[in-house]
């Protein structure tokens, strides 16, 4: 399948985890993918291994405006446009409320929410030039579940969803769609470094479909929303969590 042939995409957080799985999928379907990550070496290694042969990497701190501007300039200088943005970069913390400091709050907001804003600000300007765009933001099903011990993370991911819906309203006339995918607990490198690694069996009991989520389970929904086929869908939130959240 080559449904992204001729399309240029940026995927943040693509050195590992869900971001990398998404970038790999878009690349395998003929997109020209920029693997963007604060871990520039990791992004470069991932891009080198990508199927399709046209991937490249740019190191980027998405919480830093100058770094985000430089990323988009690099993409335009190399390929002349931007069609697809997937905001997958995130910090996944585990901090009980009584231990949550303002500095920790800001650390998470800087990456998860500020980063999404900064990436969208640069990307939308480029997409408007072409009269086409797909933005897919990775939120979380924790915003519906009220997951404890990570209030700042939940707030940041809820902000991403609300932000995306507001953008969708403003950008429809520009033929730019903005949607959110809300994964459940997913077995990634980041999760394995937190206490969440011990929660899979409990979460499985809440799921309609049994099993442990992997990055590959999230990819198809993102790829669809990033494609031309999803032109009539915007401002939506799709929980991809084996039916843990049902409404």
State where each predicted segment sits.
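Active-site helix of classical SDR
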Residues: 120, 156, 164
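Alpha-helical segment proximal to the catalytic Tyr-Lys
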Residues: 125, 169-173, 231
